[in-house]
Every structure is written in C-alpha cells, then in structure tokens.
C-alpha cells in the first residue's frame, strides 16, 4: 500500500526495532510509525542536518549523516551526540558501527552515547554501505573497496571484492553477504 509519509522531504533509510519503524532523511527529517507503517509521526530533533542512515539495537535507535543522534524512546525524541559526518550505520554484538568518507569508521559499545574513531585501512576511499552478519561487520564503497571486521569494528582488513565499480549498499541474509553498486552485484562465496 502507498501510505502518506507526512513529509515532502526525501527519506533515505528505515530501521525497525521495539515494534517501531524509524525513517530518516533530508534536512533532519525523522518519521516514526508504531502501527506497522500505516501512519507516520515526526520525531523531535532540533537540527536540520541531513540524516543518511539509521539502525536499532539494545532499545536504542542511532541515526547519522552530518551528525550522530540517538533515541532511547522509540524515536520520539533525539539527542545529538557528535557533529562527525558519516553515511551508514549498522548494529551487531552490542556494537553500533558507522562508516563514511575517506575510510571513516566509528564504533560505539555504549548504545551510541560515545564513539571511537577506528583505523579502517580504507583511507582515500568513501565508504557508503555497512552491514553485520556471521559475527562480522562489512563496509564497502568507492572503487570496489570492501573491508571487514571480526572484532566488533575495532580493527579492519581488506577483502578483494573483485570489482572496481562504486559499491553503495550491502546486506546479509541466508548466510550470504550481497553488495550492490554501479552496474554491479557481488555475493560472498563463504
């Protein structure tokens, strides 16, 4: 069904947790649905910076873009944590991990309250997508760059994606990682 979002601004990503959908987007737009997407309400945040990614874990939503923000009340109210700019966020093993331009990786083990910059080995490459599965985080981006962490985002190693195209998004399901990008789909072999 096509339902009204209640906004004229672009929405970029959606996450689900605690029976709540949260969608984030252009100029700080935050939309919240607690009835399986039938109706959408505004979350309260005092800024108008773009939000590109959102994830849920441990009863906390974390959204990021030109700011890191978090909500512990199912997206009704949001607090700014950092002014660092990132593109995507994922949650796994009680850890939030965010990625962004020039190989930026940050992680949080306290539900998004504080963040630690990590060395990704991807300096010079914009990272656009991030996911968690099989106790690993994977991030991907510019020029086919693909990196993984097996220790909750603390350290990262390069993985040969076998492509040089821009990669934009990655997901995990049925024991496979699938990344997509510019005229490209990559699938993990193990």
Model-derived features with residue positions:
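Residue-level hotspots at or immediately adjacent to binding/recognition sites across diverse folds
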Residues: 1-190
